[in-house]
Amino acid sequence: LPQRAPTLAADGRPFQSPDVMAPHWQAILCDLDGCLISGEVALPGVQAFCRSIGERLWIVSNNSTDSPASLGARLRDLGLPIADERLILAGAEAVRALSQRAPAAPVALFASPTLIAYAERLGLEVSEQEPDTVLLCRDVGFDYAALRRILGLLEAGAELVVANPDVSHPSLAGTPVPETGALLAAIRSIRPRQRFHVIGKPEPHLFAIAMARAGTTADRALMIGDNEATDGAGADALGMAFLRVVPNLGLGHLLGDATC
């Protein structure tokens, strides 16, 4: 992958970067963890960033724990009042895609209680009884028993869909927080030839949803993220400009002299 310089050095020195305030950008697509928040903490300058970007801002995240409503509520508590329809999340969109493809087909969903409830509200049949599909999300309750059940379902012919491929994301302290990709690695350590379909970044699905809702095209959209392998590779594949930032330093420096 091409390694682009981030927009801010670890010691806080700014680098030259694309002007996020330029009117050319009809949509600013932004990653969540490491860019706007870290866990339950809003990063420096992000409230001002969100106010300045306004209606051009779309969150495109490999979050596979929350529904748009649950994440929207958390963000509002952090002073980030971003409308739920602007939160495009890998887990929620994986659930939505399956509910639209075959709503009556049973799906074994390994995910948070929030996402399971979201799937049921969309009419998806969540069941481990002869499912057509196994949907793997960031299930913090994932354990040996869950791994055995997944392996049995795949052996029986179920399709494997993975919300997001990230192995981890950095905590505010810099330590890795396990992600869905780590759970996938456990499956693939036993079934190395297992085929699977990814919904989240770097695949185009989330980017396409954001552009459709924004009513724009890739050449008029800018992706901001801290992960070259997901944010950067996904943007590159669509011909979209990408601006890489250092994880957990916030986005206030991107505003330059803009006032809020």
Question: Where do the PLM segments sit?
Answer:
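Asp-based, Mg2+/Mn2+-dependent phosphohydrolase catalytic module
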Residues: 1-52, 58, 64, 68-86, ...
